[in-house]
Amino acid sequence: MGGCVGKGRRHIEEDKLDFKGGNVHVITSKEDWDRKIEEANKDGKIVVANFSASWCGPCRVIAPIYAEMSKTYPQLMFLTIDVDDLMDFSSSWDIRATPTFFFIKNEKQVDKLVGANKPELEKKVQALADGS
């Protein structure tokens, strides 16, 4: 499964991606991001950041899988950022397609995955969890 490219159309609030049942922190501001990154550093956690969009089909497919991973790997911190809600912030990460996953340790990117590739996401998350 691939990713969505380009700036999408906005949907109403109820169209937000569903991460229920997981331990995914929804980032709604740069301040939220800074707080969570600081918390992860303090706790020695690796961050998995999912840049996604509510209108993106592959993002909708991977959302419940991402939520499940957040429960399976509590030693990691799972964040999600809606690229339409935080356009400037997302642009600073050079997001070209959604979903894009960044893996961050000690405030530095250690890996990246573009697209809703479940096996590859699971492999990367597992490797980071094993090494944390």
UniProtKB/Swiss-Prot annotation:
Residues annotated as the enzyme's active site: 56 (nucleophile), 59 (nucleophile)
Cross-referenced Pfam families: Thioredoxin
Alphabetical list of SUPFAM superfamilies matching this protein: Thioredoxin-like (SSF52833)
Keyword annotations: Cytoplasm, Disulfide bond, Electron transport, Redox-active center, Transport
Site (Contributes to redox potential value): 57-58
Positions of the Thioredoxin domain: 18-130
Coiled coil: none
GO CC terms, sorted: cytoplasm
Record-linked InterPro entries: Thioredoxin-like_sf, Thioredoxin_CS, Thioredoxin_domain, Thioredoxin_H-type-like
Localization (cell): Cytoplasm
Cross-referenced Gene3D superfamilies: Glutaredoxin
PROSITE patterns: THIOREDOXIN_1, THIOREDOXIN_2
Cystine pairings recorded for this chain: 56-59
PANTHER family linked: THIOREDOXIN, THIOREDOXIN H4-2
Entry's family note: Belongs to the thioredoxin family. Plant H-type subfamily.
Function summary: Probable thiol-disulfide oxidoreductase that may be involved in the redox regulation of a number of cytosolic enzymes.
Protein name per its UniProtKB record: Thioredoxin H4-2
Native source species: Oryza sativa subsp. japonica (Rice)
Taxonomic placement: Eukaryota, Viridiplantae, Streptophyta, Embryophyta, Tracheophyta
